[in-house]
Design a protein with these regions (language model features):
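Hydrophobic ligand-binding cavity/cleft-lining segments
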Residues: 1-51
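Hydrophobic-ligand binding "helix-grip"
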Residues: 43, 50-51, 57-117
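Generic hydrophobic alpha-helical segments
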Residues: 39, 76, 132-133
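A conserved amphipathic terminal alpha-helix motif
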Residues: 1-8, 111-136
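Tryptophan-centric aromatic hotspots in well-structured domains and transmembrane helices
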Residues: 33-36, 82, 123-126
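Juxtamembrane/interface motifs at transmembrane-helix termini
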Residues: 52-55, 126-128
């Protein structure tokens, strides 16, 4: 699925232990979901080599990030634990999606962040990942 540059970041919010990145994609929810559930879509989001399995299944990306699938609801939500590397504390990445107008609203929330984690870098990471996921 190729998404023109109309995909926009609507907000990037931060709290003490979480960040949130919101994008509106001018594609139907069903197309966005199909893209996310294909190998290149999930790799675009989580990193090369990452594959989502059933709830409780681990995933690993070649950049060292890893986690476990926590929740998977078709055309609604994907929630994974996320570790930046083997020594990093567990955090949670929750991607919610819903129809908005003729497109899809994506809301990615990265929770349970420690004070040492660079929130600006994480916002940039997830913003870029969401764009990659919706560009192919």
């Amino acid at each position: 699925m190729t998404v023109p540059h109309e995909a926009e970041v609507e907000a990037a919010a931060q709290t003490a232990d979480a960040i949130e990145v919101v994008q509106h994609v001018p594609r139907p929810l069903s197309e966005v979901w199909v893209r996310l559930t294909q190998r290149d879509g999930i790799e675009a989001l989580l990193g090369e080599g990452a594959m989502l399995g059933a709830k409780g299944d681990p995933w690993h990306a070649s950049d060292g990030t890893r986690g476990v699938t926590r929740s998977y609801h078709p055309e609604q939500q994907v929630r994974v634990s996320w570790h930046a590397d083997d020594q990093a504390p567990a955090t949670v990445v929750d991607l919610q999606m819903r129809t908005e107008g003729e497109g899809t609203l994506l809301t990615l929330r990265h929770e349970h962040l420690t004070p040492e984690m660079d929130r600006e870098a994480l916002v940039a990471r997830w913003d870029a990942a969401m764009h990659r996921m919706t560009q192919v």
